[in-house]
């Protein structure tokens, strides 16, 4: 009788077990790396919004900062196709990219975070603003919350699980240390 060549069932089970052990070690590290990348992107987005706000304030002094209900949309282009044919206007300043200007809800998040802008001013000119970012899926896309106001200093809350509607006073509190 000829001896058959190949792997035995035990050998195959051992190989599968080794692969599962390696996956069990690697997958959590991969998820933590993704959360870290999303948080870095969120902090960068806050910085981009701050830069856009300064440019907006300089370009449209009668409006002040873009700090009303459509603040992020005002900083970006009106459509994904780009700026209006006549050039930027205060309702479509084209200072930030389309994806960031639309990242105002969980469904329209940018790199796992969505953003909001609040103001203490009731009407234009808006002389103050606070921008904040929250994870779209807490503990999956991010853990920390981020905020900043017109001073440009970015603050982070180590476990922020709420909508991005942080006020200037909360952003400056001890619960939100500077980055």
Labelled PLM ranges:
Residues 160-164:
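A short acidic/small-residue loop/turn micro-motif
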Residues 168-179:
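Short, low-complexity, Pro/Ser/Thr/Gly-rich segments in the mature regions of secreted, periplasmic
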Residues 2-30:
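N-terminal single-pass transmembrane signal-anchor helix
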Residues 26, 33, 53:
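Conserved alpha-helical elements of the SDR catalytic core
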Residues 29-46:
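Aliphatic-rich helix starts adjacent to a transmembrane/signal segment
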Residues 51-144, 148-151, 158, 177-179:
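Extracellular/periplasmic head regions of type IV pilus-like filament subunits
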Residues 24, 39, 55:
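Functionally critical, cavity-lining and gating residues within the transmembrane helices
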């Amino acid at each position: 009788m000829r001896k058959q060549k190949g792997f035995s069932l035990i050998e195959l089970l051992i190989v599968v077990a080794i692969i599962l052990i390696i996956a069990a070690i690697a997958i959590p590290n991969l998820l933590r790396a993704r959360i870290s990348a999303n948080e870095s992107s969120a902090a960068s987005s806050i910085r981009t919004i701050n830069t856009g706000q300064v440019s907006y304030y300089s370009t449209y002094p009668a409006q002040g900062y873009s700090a009303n209900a459509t603040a992020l949309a005002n900083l970006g282009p009106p459509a994904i196709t780009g700026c209006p044919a006549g050039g930027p206007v205060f309702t479509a300043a084209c200072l930030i990219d389309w994806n960031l200007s639309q990242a105002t809800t969980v469904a329209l998040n940018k790199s796992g975070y969505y953003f909001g802008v609040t103001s203490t001013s009731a009407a234009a000119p808006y002389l103050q603003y606070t921008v904040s970012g929250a994870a779209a899926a807490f503990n999956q896309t991010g853990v920390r919350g981020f905020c900043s106001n017109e001073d440009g200093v970015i603050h982070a809350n180590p476990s922020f699980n709420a909508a991005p509607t942080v006020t200037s006073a909360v952003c400056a509190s001890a619960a939100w240390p500077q980055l």
